[in-house]
């Protein structure tokens, strides 16, 4: 355990917050995209589809790198049991709170919007369970994955710490080219695992809990570990905060490949396996693009930025049902996709900020949506 706090990484705090907030335009643009979602506009927009695909291709990979970075930083600061307890509470309590307060009402809303209420009694017990798994976890899936990664990383982080204590500090002698090869091979390995599952027991890939607990965790664990390694090796972090033309061009080419795979790939063939390889390497390259831009533009302290850093998780949690409400009841009355998209941003962000301010004034809600217990103020009054 280290008693010396690490310097504040303002740009990483900011990037993490903006990646969370990108979930709002991501889901609103999904309404107007060619992708089939819970609610869609009458006519899709090609440019909002492109915008949606771009966000989807890299956002969570970069997010999990930052999560791994801060997780290991806190691992060195706290005793093991306290570290695990704090980390799990910070993500687990908001997730468990959001299920009854947000995703359950959202599920009920969608049942009426999609006129599925009459079909519910006809479903089998497993179909009901699986439907609830998908719908109640919903956009909270990354919190569940973070709980799993935090638990799994206990052994990995302990091993990293012992290596740091027993060996002399040395540079992480690995270039971005070598990292790209490693992540390409990791993408191929993930694709192979998925293909084997598809051949042996394809039905399990449609199981919500299996998807969240196994498949999503397997895909994002390399990015989580990479974040921890970036904290351990400052030279590795420097590779990500230094602009790389190769990474920028590589990410652009990977995104084109991603779009072509979306356009011409088939789910019954190799589309999902190909996508996993593409998004694995694109995610790595976008870490460089996002970190270098963030380091140059966001590495400063600002009260306004700090406000959104603190508010980002709450806003992300509440934005999803607000977006679905907007798509179901307001989108049909707006003929222009552009105007609808902009109105959606204003509607969702405006209400989310109002709800955020309200919840700050209710201690129980503030605890439930942050996982942070209230700080006890010691009385300064003197007796006698």
UniProtKB/Swiss-Prot annotation:
Record NCBIfam families: PRK03854.1 (NF003014)
Organism (species): Salmonella heidelberg (strain SL476)
Family named by the database record: Belongs to the acyltransferase 3 family. OpgC subfamily.
Domain of life: Bacteria
InterPro entries: Acyl_transf_3_dom (IPR002656), Glucan_succinyl_AcylTrfase (IPR050623), Glucans_biosynth_C (IPR023723)
CC terms in the record's Gene Ontology section: plasma membrane
Protein's recorded name: Glucans biosynthesis protein C
Transmembrane segments: 17-37, 54-74, 91-111, 140-160, 173-193, 212-232, 240-260, 274-294, 311-331, 338-358
Membrane topology type: Multi-pass membrane protein
Broad enzyme group: transferase
Biological process, per Gene Ontology: glucan biosynthetic process
Pathway: Glycan metabolism; osmoregulated periplasmic glucan (OPG) biosynthesis
Localization per record: Cell membrane
UniProt entry keywords in alphabetical sequence: Acyltransferase, Cell membrane, Membrane, Transferase, Transmembrane, Transmembrane helix
Presence of the UniProt keyword Transferase in the record: yes
Keyword Phosphoprotein: no
């Amino acid at each position: 355990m280290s008693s010396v706090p690490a310097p504040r990484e303002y740009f990483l705090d900011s990037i993490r917050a903006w990646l969370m907030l990108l979930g709002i335009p991501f889901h609103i643009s999904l309404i107007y995209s060619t992708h089939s979602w819970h609610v869609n506009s009458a006519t899709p927009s090609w440019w909002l589809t492109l915008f949606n695909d771009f966000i989807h291709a890299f956002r969570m990979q970069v997010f999990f790198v930052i999560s791994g970075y801060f997780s290991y930083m806190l691992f060195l600061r706290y005793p093991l049991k306290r570290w695990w307890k704090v980390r799990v509470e910070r993500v687990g309590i908001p997730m468990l709170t959001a299920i009854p307060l947000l995703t359950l009402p959202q599920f009920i809303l969608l049942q009426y919007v999609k006129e599925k209420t009459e079909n519910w009694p006809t479903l089998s017990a497993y179909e009901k369970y699986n439907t609830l798994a998908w719908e109640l976890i919903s956009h909270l899936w990354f919190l569940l994955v973070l709980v799993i990664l935090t638990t799994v990383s206990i052994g990995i982080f302990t091993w990293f710490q012992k290596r740091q204590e027993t060996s002399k500090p040395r540079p992480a002698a690995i270039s971005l080219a070598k990292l790209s090869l490693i992540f390409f091979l990791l993408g191929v390995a993930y694709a192979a695992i998925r293909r084997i599952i598809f051949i042996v027991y394809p039905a399990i890939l449609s199981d919500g809990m299996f998807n969240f607990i196994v498949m999503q965790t397997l895909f994002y664990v390399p990015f989580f570990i990479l974040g921890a390694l970036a904290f351990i090796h400052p030279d590795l972090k420097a590779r990500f905060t230094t602009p790389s033309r190769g990474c920028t061009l590589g990410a652009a080419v990977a995104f084109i490949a991603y779009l072509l795979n979306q356009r011409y790939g088939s789910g019954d063939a190799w589309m999902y396996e190909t996508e996993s390889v593409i998004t694995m390497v694109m995610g790595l390259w976008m870490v460089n693009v996002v970190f270098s831009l963030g380091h140059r533009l966001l590495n400063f302290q600002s009260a306004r930025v700090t406000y959104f850093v603190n508010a980002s998780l709450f806003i992300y949690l509440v934005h999803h049902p607000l977006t679905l409400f907007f798509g179901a009841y307001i989108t049909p009355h707006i003929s222009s996709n552009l105007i609808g998209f902009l109105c959606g941003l204003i509607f969702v962000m405006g209400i989310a900020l109002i709800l955020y301010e309200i919840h700050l004034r209710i201690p129980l809600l503030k605890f439930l949506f942050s996982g942070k217990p209230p700080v006890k103020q010691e009385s300064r009054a003197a007796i006698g």
